[in-house]
Amino acid sequence: VTRLIATDLDGTLLRDDKTLSARTVAALTAAEEAGIEVFFVTGRPARWMDVVRNHVQSHGTAICANGAVVTDLRTDGGLLAVRALERDAALHVVHTLREAAPGTSFAVEMTTGINYEPAYPPFHLDPGASVAVAEKLLHEDTPGAGAPVLKLLAHHTELAPDAFLDLARTTAGDRASITRSSPSALLEVSGLGVSKATTLAACCAERGIAPAEVVAFGDMPNDIEMLSWAGASFAMGNAHPDVVAAAKGRTAANEEDGVALVIERILAARAEGRAEAR
């Protein structure tokens, strides 16, 4: 029996225009009314959660930054847990990737916001960001740099995204967890062992929820461990091939309400007293 639904946001629950369809909102509401907890599990930092803040269940909990943060969206992003990336590990990855993939630029996502190198592309302009080389951004004596590091971001302008990920994991994967969720060659580096899956597993253990009672949804490599861990899991119709291989099932694309389709099926089966259609 499903007790918890864990869903990624971008490319999964959200449409391409970063909104939730009316059908998806209705499915989320119906799940809560049926006693199923829904967790948003995303690579986004907590400060980018406004898009779903009005749709979080009464528990308020969301997992952000690929598992580095558990936040309470009811308290305007209050942090319930932080799994930081140690600075020496981050610096090791910086130095390793600079050597292995010249031209790599970096950004540092902290609990206080993002800072980045001059060469790092401004995916989202942040007027409060500090701009300096990564070593300075990671130096605790730099003003504002003493906060916990949630993610190191690494961008390359020429390498193919999967090739960049493979290179980074081969050269630096012994010191940090490295994944990606962007269509560009943008890598997300977390503390060793930190992932959506490990943080979700901890949250479920606190609630006495077993993996077999969890249904998970995702579309990109940073979802793979979570989809493998959950008892039932679905790759979106628009998912990366590696995600399709890792998931136990497949649903429609994010533009076609793929998450809502499965939730509706689960609830319909439950209402009829049948085994859930997973």
Where are these regions (language model features)?
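Short, structured coil segments at secondary-structure junctions
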Residues: 56-58, 65-66, 172-174, 229-230, ...
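Hydrophobic packing residues within well-ordered alpha-helices of enzyme cores
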Residues: 24, 49-53, 164, 168, ...
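Conserved acidic, metal-coordinating active-site core of Asp-based
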Residues: 100-217, 221-222, 226
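Residue-level signal for inorganic ion chemistry
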Residues: 11, 31, 42, 66, ...
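Asp-based phosphoryl-transfer active-site loop
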Residues: 3-16
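Active-site phosphate-binding/coordination module
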Residues: 22-123
